[in-house]
Amino acid sequence: FVQHASDMEPCGEEEVRRFLEKLYQDTGGDNWRFQENWCTDKPLSEWGSSVKYEDGKLSLILGENNLHGKIDLSGCTALVSLRCAKNSLTEIDVSGCPLLEELDCTNCGISGLDVSGCYSLRRLLCGYNSLTELGLSSCPYLTELNVPYNGLGTLDISSCMALTDLNCAENRLEKLDMAGREGLRMLFCYGNRLSVLDLSKCSSLTLVNCGANELTRLDLSGCEKLGRLYCYDNRLETLDLSDFAPLLSELYCYGNRLTELDLSGTDRLSQLECSYNNLQRLDLTGCKSLRIAGCARNALRSISLFGCEMLGQLDCSGNLLENIDISACPYLTELICTDNLILSEIPESFDRLTLFEHDIRYEYSVEKDAVTGQEKIVYMDRGKGWWYSGEPDKGYHGR
């Protein structure tokens, strides 16, 4: 296809001029923000900064230019780049543009986009529109596809085996066939209706965000380069990190149904958010790079922080913990551990914390003595929580 496209003779300057004059008329050119020398007799090279025409190849930069209506450049064989983001368009037709390599029509409001016959297309940015379908069968060399926040119910990328970056987030997709795409590096498919996602043997993947779907199965086997994984708000009961544990730096798996989480070998993990699951224990032993950890709202009875020497923030609220040992975390400055079963005196080592949210064992109030009329401090023992040395006799919660 590329050979065929490169051999095709691009249309001449006069034909290009006719395409541009029609574009001007179709999209309300008189109201454009930038229209310098458009539709004049001057050479196309003098039609302002929005037109670049050299060696028979045409590039258009029309972003945020107050275009309205439909862009029809179908059959413009000289077109190599079209940037028209942030306009008020209804439809874009660039079919039969075999030299077109880049199209950016982000946030234009279009409901129709025709890229058939765009055999050279490598970069397609069409997010934040109203597309319900998108045909890509004639785009075999597409490497970057950005189509988030549309209304797509299906997305057939079977012909686009060169993809390295795919963003199809916030659509209505129920299926996405991605297995075996060894060149894929980044995938954003959050906010869809996926129940299964097979990314096995996607050996170049470094980032996956598949959050806010309906996933019950996520296959990441063979994803040996994966460093950032966001699979939050799904229905996962298991999560296997073994194939990429040594490179994993960020894991956000909150809002699932996980009962266990094996983090062994995750030496580079710096951010962990696994709140709102069904975890009963969490072993962070050896997570020497961990800086932020959130494990709130689980069923944790124990948490091991041995070796977490870089940990700075920990939220373990809403669990069943009876104690917590932070002695191995010299850089911890923020600890949230409310709503647990902890019954403990606050050690002096906790005084370094800049944020310490905890259950307070003793509640103090002031009452008047019924006989003398003098005020006195009384307390109620909640039976759980933290207290400082000297409480409750000293009558206040503090060092």
Predicted regions and their residues:
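Leucine-rich repeat
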Residues: 76-79, 97-100, 118-121, 139-142, ...
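Extracytoplasmic Gram-positive cell-surface binding/anchoring modules and repeats
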Residues: 395-399
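Canonical leucine-rich repeat
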Residues: 70-71, 92, 113, 134, ...
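N-terminal capping/linker segments that flank leucine-rich repeat
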Residues: 1-81, 98, 119, 140, ...
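Conserved hydrophobic beta-strand positions in leucine-rich repeat
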Residues: 58-62, 82-84, 101-105, 122-126, ...
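Consensus "Asn ladder" position of solenoid repeat domains
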Residues: 65, 87, 108, 129, ...
